[in-house]
Amino acid sequence: MKPRILSYGEIIFDLVGGKPFLGGAALNFAWVVNQLGGEATLISAVGNDDFGLEALSIIENYGINGHINFSGHPTGTAIVDSDGKFDIAHPAAWNQIEIPDLEDGAYDLLYMGTLAQMSSFNRERLANLLQSLTVVVFLDLNLRPPFYSKEIIFDSLRMANIVKVNVEEWQEIKKLTVIEDPFGFMDYFNLSHLAITRGYEGASFFFDGQELQYRPRKITEIDPTGAGDAFSAGLAMGILSNIPAIDILKLGCDAGAAVAGIRGAHMKLPYSVRAQLIL
């Protein structure tokens, strides 16, 4: 049976050089999950505008299941600079994500970040959802200043089983928690897995008192947008599929590297990546 995954969070059009590319961490994650043989269901919101209608059409064409409501705010947008930094328009539709009633036991994992939790509207509904489901929670912090707080970070970590951060976010987390050791951090928040990504240098993977490192082959980076989300999708699918830990890490790194080598977050993954996970 395919891993069944809920992907909760924002839909955003990334404006790169003035050209719009459909993205948002939750959508990017779902797109890669489906390519790796999973069955993703996206929970998000768009505005009743041209971008919103375009997003719904594209998502339908992608074959991604969705619970996507229309919000009173415009569809999310973000200006992305050459370093991959985001200037996110706010407020936006992703501030008001309605969550339908979902059957407990119907899903294996829920993916979430911190950006969509900036609104109390979303935090309340997400907390209620997690109380109603027995599911593995994958937290990809995706810290986007100024759209996070210590309270949101700590609450999210307490809900999580698996956490992925990049190396800059890890430095921020160490300051907030005053915990330097990854295993001490995992013990404090009762995590089963922790991944720290380091861009072209690969990533570290912590689990069961063990640490693994992997560095993918060097690529020519075109656009880092969505690479971290692809890594998370590979990691989640690898964990749910019970493949060896080093293969989980390799899958995540190779998926992220493939996406970083093209412009925009939605590429068809090369067979060399997809073939690592034959379900």
Over which residues does each language-model region extend?
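Glycine-rich phosphate/adenosyl-contacting loop at the front of the ribokinase-like
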Residues: 1-64
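Structural motif
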Residues: 4-6, 108-109, 162, 193
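Active-site metal-binding loops of divalent metal-dependent hydrolases
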Residues: 10-11, 25, 115, 141, ...
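Alpha-helical segments flanking ligand/cofactor-binding loops in enzyme cores
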Residues: 31, 57, 154, 183-184, ...
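Conserved beta-alpha-beta core of the PfkB/ribokinase-like small-molecule kinase fold
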Residues: 109-184, 202-203
